[in-house]
Regions:
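Interfacial segments of multi-pass membrane proteins
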Residues: 49-52, 75-78, 112-143, 157-165
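Cytosolic, membrane-interface loops and tails of multi-pass inner-membrane proteins
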Residues: 25-57, 108-109, 189-206
């Protein structure tokens, strides 16, 4: 098979798998509700965690990660695809599919968990180190709502760490392409400004 045809096939395959939104399926199955009508309306693991149940949120996040991790592993183990770019196209395709899912009118989630699935395949050691640091920073120092900051720190730190590990250049490029795509999907949350609640001014009665 022509190299570029292989890349296209892997990208499309990853995209079709990534287009399955487990947040939609699990929420409907467990509570018979539409995840888009709950919380912030985002069809992602964190919204399921907060509005459907912690267990179901964690399960959703794991399944979203599996969308990238398992197809990449299967492609390597059973289809003997060793080309780093081809494997990366599966992961990138899954990330794009989660953000612009074919089966849900191209309205998807933020794809952080799916990207972390790709990271688990390519840069597993860096991901584990970043996870440990992330937990310490979030719960030891910041002590704020997990929200967007947990995944953002994890993704950024994993990407930075991979630059200092002996990976081939293609892996590092794919890791950062995935990070930039996910950053694009999260652009509204990262630039969001919280409204300040005006303080009540007490007036002395004359």
């Amino acid at each position: 098979m022509n190299q570029y045809v292989l890349y296209l096939v892997c990208l499309v395959a990853g995209y079709l798998i990534g287009s399955v939104l487990f947040a939609e399926l699990i929420t409907k199955l467990v509570s018979n509700q539409n995840i888009r009508e709950l919380g912030n309306g985002n069809p992602g693991a964190y919204n399921v965690f907060r509005n459907v149940g912690k267990f179901w949120g964690v399960l959703t996040g794991l399944l979203d990660a599996v969308k990238a991790l398992v197809p990449m592993w299967i492609a390597y183990q059973f289809f003997h695809i060793t080309d780093t770019t081809a494997l990366g196209c599966i992961g990138i395709g899954a990330v794009i599919g989660h953000g612009y899912p074919l089966y849900y009118h191209f309205k998807g989630g933020r794809a952080a968990s799916t990207l972390l699935g790709m990271y688990a395949y390519f840069i597993g050691i860096e991901l584990l180190i970043a996870l440990a640091v992330d937990v310490i920073v979030l719960f030891g120092f910041i002590k704020k709502e997990y929200g967007i900051w947990g995944p953002s720190i994890l993704i950024a730190l994993s990407g930075i760490l991979c630059l200092f590990f002996p990976h081939e250049l293609g892996v590092k490029i794919l890791v950062w392409i995935g990070a930039l795509i996910t950053l694009f999907f999260n652009r509204d949350k990262l630039t969001e400004k919280k409204e300040k609640v005006p303080k009540k001014v007490s007036r002395q009665q004359s």
